[in-house]
Amino acid sequence: MNALVAHNSKAWDKKVETGNEWTVAVEQQVIEQAKKGNWDIRVTPMKDVPKDWFPPIKGLKVLCLASGGGQQGPVLAAAGADVTVLDNSEKQLNQDRMIAERDGLTIHTVKGSMDDLSVFNDESFDVIVHPVANVFVENVLPVWKEAYRVLKRNGILISGFVNPVVFLFDTELEQQGVLKVKHSIPYADPEDLPKHKVKKLIENNEALEFGHSLEDQIKGQIDAGFIVTGFYEDKGGFVLDQYIHTYSATRSVKV
């Protein structure tokens, strides 16, 4: 495990402890409804993934990629999928384990990094669900290549990601409602922030983030062998949201 992966693992353990929105597991009634066939999941903050992005879910082998936290995996398992959740945070995985025990679900959990799926054989899954997470890896291209490898032919990859435009601005001024361009894209916390700020992030167990270009996010999937068949945009908690959607989601098919 490299230093970045190890650090962000601890950072996400901390996010679980502090109740970050992406770490709060779904309520029991959500699981009860999913067992009846009434379910939705999100890979971006506000919008549900369109139902027609999924094939009939029962019996499908689904990998929830960098998707711990008890939000996507348990819902899909309750709906009838054979679910594996891979995440870099043990405490995020514990959220899925807790829901599985509480609600009588079978969920396989694997601790690992989204850019190294060597624990899985080629063509192991029918669907990969990858919510906003690749902002925490330095290079997103291996994520797409590994996803392609472990998907079956005609398998589906559903991904959410941050629009890199959010990384252009001075974060301290943005917190005051002021948008001032300061950085370029691609962006990386360890290289683009002053050393003392990076040191503080590390000391405080705050996750290090990376703003990948749209070319790497979308063309990266195409270059890996996918055909992009669906797209939508969403909003989050940025000041910039009043001017442009700051999140995107794609549906891609392995051919």
Curated annotation (Swiss-Prot):
Species classification: Bacteria, Bacillati, Bacillota, Bacilli, Bacillales
Family according to the record: Belongs to the methyltransferase superfamily.
Domain of life: Bacteria
Alphabetized Pfam families for the sequence: Methyltransf_11
GO MF term set: methyltransferase activity; S-adenosylmethionine-dependent methyltransferase activity
Protein name (database record): Uncharacterized methyltransferase YbaJ
Keywords: Methyltransferase, Transferase
Gene Ontology biological process terms, A to Z: methylation
